[in-house]
Amino acid sequence: MRYIRIDKVEPGDILGKDIVDINGKVLLKASSDMTLSENIIAKIKERNIQGIYVDDEISKGINIEEAIPMTVRHMAIKALKKKDVQETEKIAEDIVNNFDGKVEIDLNRMMGDVSYFERAVNISELCLSLGKRLEFSDDSLSKLVASALLADIGLIMTEEEKKQILEKVPQDLREKILSLPNESASPILGKFVAAQNQADPMVIHSVYFHKENENGTGVIQNVYEQWGIQQKCDVRDTAKIIHICSDYIDALIRENDFTKARNMIEEGIVQGKYNYILASNFLRFIPMYPIGTLVQLSNGEIAAVVKNNDGFPLCPIVKLQTGEQLDLTKTLNVVIQDIYYSNKKGKQL
């Protein structure tokens, strides 16, 4: 199977995977005879679903699995919708315990997950993958995942919730916070939410500082300077990892392009935005071409990505239309030239 953006789906395509809404409800069940009609495609679009999985000859035998079980994902989304900090911390442990590190990250799906809640779970998945690569302990991974899930909780607070959270804050400080733009106020509000719900100190720190840059600039640093506070942000690795992963997901959603999202991280390293060691490790495991992606090879053939080679994001294992597989780390005279969908050339997926 392979993932296709909904605007690229055509009548006659076969649904390869159940279509599930944000609450875990199955909207359309996949089967070998589930051929999509114009009417069904229109109804899928009405649900604001960004893309689906289809089965076709070239992607036959390619299974795209979930690193985080869907049941656990939906539990996390439910807790976030309730803004339940303690429940989110518990679910973060479940995510770590149930995470399958052998399953490749499904960037195609992440590119279509545009809701705040899906985005938060996707960021936590990337953070967890990087944390495992860096050999974090399970306890540290749980705190990292909880921090990633809660990082932008300030963005979804109502005006009434903001006032309630800041109720015990001195009036002059409360007015300063409420007068800030949403992006600047969000980490401050998130810190108060986490602290007032007895979150782990590492979670509180990471929520507060996850928008700070390696070169000493950033959202909170700018607020400090604006308020005349002579203090430099001391940012820990958990917050730095969330910064990298959240920026990548945002670029992926905004650009609809794996290459542009990756280039944004590379440019950020050069500009001093991201920690070099953490960002470099991130780029080593993030694939340029996710499983199921159709690509055009330099020999003129079209192929589907079957598996990515760790450390070689430009050289996956691909399956030709003949069924033959090529490992591009070993077939040095063949490279990927472009991305295809439905045999139609297109950079934007």
At which residue positions do the language-model features occur?
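Terminal helices and disordered tails flanking the catalytic cores of nucleotide-processing hydrolases
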Residues: 1-90, 214-235, 254-349
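Short amphipathic alpha-helical segments, especially helix-boundary/capping motifs
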Residues: 14-19, 100-107, 160-163, 239-243, ...
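A broad detector of the eukaryotic-type serine/threonine protein kinase catalytic domain
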Residues: 24, 128-132, 246-249
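Short, flexible active-site loop motifs that bind/organize anionic cofactors or intermediates
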Residues: 31, 113, 131, 251, ...
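Short glycine-/small-residue-rich flexible loop motifs, especially phosphate/cofactor-binding loops
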Residues: 41, 128, 186
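Acidic/His-rich, divalent-metal-binding segments that scaffold phosphate/diphosphate chemistry
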Residues: 55-179, 196
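Alpha-helical scaffolding flanking metal-ion-dependent phosphate/phosphodiester catalytic sites
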Residues: 123, 146-157, 169-280, 288, ...
